[in-house]
Amino acid sequence: WIQQHTPDDISGGYSESLSDMIVDSRETLLRVLHYPHLTGHEPTGALRAAAHEDINLITILPSSNQSGLQVKGSDGRWIDVPEGDDKLVVNIGDMLQEVSGGYYPSTTHRVINPTFAANKPRMSLPLFLHPRPDVRLSERYTAASYLEERLRELGVK
């Protein structure tokens, strides 16, 4: 869907189609994130996961069973992502921002304490779609070199 709705002058710069970039990738991963229920002493709106962007191409996640996920709009305001069984959230990652030359900016997002039903735990199942390490993201980076640099910046490597 993203590839189909990308202007030709942008997608023409891709080294290969987005769907081909993830074929046979061993970097793609599914995570199970559990946020325990709140005790009632935590302030509403306090951070559970600080604002960040994902390193990968695209993150796909079914909407959580609990509110709290927010995305940062282009105006700098935080927008609540609705929860519900029939919703799917798609976040643009840093690698797609790189491969698109900034046409698709990374989705800045965070998780805050819910305003209601805080006695329920929050579950999230993000699927982080990564390209194969050999995929050329830009003149400057392959997927492997980009990931390595970002992990060093984060102090993970």
Per-region residue spans from a language model:
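C-terminal flanking tails of non-heme Fe-dependent oxygenases
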Residues: 1-157
